[in-house]
């Protein structure tokens, strides 16, 4: 898969070009403790390697394609303390990059200078991975632009990020199977959680049951799980998960599962101990109906902007029928969809006006948030957008009122 991804990228760049990608580096948490390493997703997409301090170089010269990888210097002492450094054999097996084209970082500067100088007469273009949010966070590619231009002012600089975003947007069968696997684990984790709901007195206990089951499947959470009961569901990214559960409340659970680096992102709402009340039922039914309509309505030629506009229209009309006359923005204040893949909010930087395209995996997540009712309802599914009819990958995860109530009452 990864060599094929590189070949697709090569087709998108100019001849006489060099593209560089950095895997990222570990960040200190406090003292000598590090945060868990999170690989740069474009680097991973092209290599399958999850190792910090590594640089991928792709060279297209006179229609020849070459791939090189530089990895951290091998340190025998480091290996006694950490098990996160892959050897060249392992890297070749995963990435299909030739063993002889993998070098240690100590050789990088001399090697790179030689390559650039060989290109001088060809007016080369050098691609760096510079995401649209590069000014908010440290960006290796952005930093390298200035270093390259100061050393080799005759080169032309280009951004590879838009190319990678468009390649990653449409998923191949292998990627879709990874997402299906994540959703399958999500389903079983959620059912396990429902089966243990009666034992729970606090939000964090619900979260704990979910995490226990998914970790037993060698998976991990894609983001901080949201378990928001009652008024807490009015806050979209509520993550304290520490409130005592109230039998009369609805609980919103927004969670994601990662396996093989691909994510699910699914939200379900359920009553605590009892059935939905009449007004809870009405609001839930409106959100559910909107969810179902949008799953079937969206087409590859539609944009995220189209999807959001139509979803808000359905919610607004429904709320008006229920007697809520204020503007819909008072009750719905987030996007109805996002792309899904290596990141939970995948390929950030794609224009919301751009067609979604076939074989994109997206979320469908309408919601309503009503402060005076202490009620937040969001129903989120993950679908593949297809010309001949979309596929709801999370269809088996219960969302009908009767299904939810039967699970709670058990």
Predicted features along the sequence, with ranges:
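Active-site neighborhoods and metal-handling regions in enzymes and metal-associated proteins
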Residues: 1-410
């Amino acid at each position: 898969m990864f060599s094929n991804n590189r070949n697709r990228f090569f087709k998108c760049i100019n001849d006489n070009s060099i593209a560089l990608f950095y895997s990222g580096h570990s960040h200190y948490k406090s003292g000598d403790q590090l945060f868990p390493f999170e690989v740069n997703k474009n680097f991973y997409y092209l290599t399958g390697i999850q190792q910090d301090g590594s640089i991928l170089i792709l060279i297209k010269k006179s229609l020849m394609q070459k791939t090189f990888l530089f990895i951290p210097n091998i340190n025998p002492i480091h290996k006694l303390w950490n098990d996160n450094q892959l050897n060249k054999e392992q890297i070749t097996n995963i990435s299909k990059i030739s063993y002889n084209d993998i070098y240690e970082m100590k050789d990088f500067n001399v090697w790179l200078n030689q390559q650039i100088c060989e290109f001088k007469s060809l007016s080369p273009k050098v691609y760096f991975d510079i995401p649209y949010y590069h000014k908010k966070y440290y960006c290796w590619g952005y930093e390298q632009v200035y270093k390259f231009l100061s050393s080799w002012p005759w080169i032309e600089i280009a951004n590879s990020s838009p190319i990678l975003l468009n390649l990653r947007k449409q998923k191949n069968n292998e990627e879709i199977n990874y997402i299906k696997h994540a959703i399958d684990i999500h389903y079983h984790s959620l059912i396990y959680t429902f089966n243990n709901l009666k034992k729970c007195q606090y939000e964090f206990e619900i979260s704990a049951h979910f995490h226990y089951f998914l970790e037993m499947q060698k998976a991990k959470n894609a983001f901080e799980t949201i378990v928001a009961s009652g008024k807490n569901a009015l806050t979209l990214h509520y993550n304290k998960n520490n409130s005592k559960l109230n039998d009369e409340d609805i609980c919103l659970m927004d969670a994601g599962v990662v396996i093989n680096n691909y994510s699910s992102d699914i939200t379900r709402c359920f009553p605590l101990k009892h059935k939905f009340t009449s007004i809870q039922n009405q609001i839930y039914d409106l959100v559910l109906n909107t969810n179902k309509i949008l799953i079937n309505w969206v087409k590859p030629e539609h944009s995220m902007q189209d999807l959001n506009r139509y979803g808000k229209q359905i919610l607004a009309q429904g709320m008006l029928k229920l007697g809520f006359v204020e503007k819909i923005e008072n009750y719905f204040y987030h996007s109805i969809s996002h792309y899904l893949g290596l990141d939970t909010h995948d390929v950030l930087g794609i224009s919301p006006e751009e067609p979604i395209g076939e074989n994109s995996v997206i979320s469908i997540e309408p919601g309503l948030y009503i402060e005076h009712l202490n009620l937040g309802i969001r129903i989120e599914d993950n679908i593949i957008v297809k010309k001949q009819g979309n596929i709801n990958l999370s269809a088996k995860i219960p969302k009908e009122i009767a299904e939810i109530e039967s699970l709670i009452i058990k």
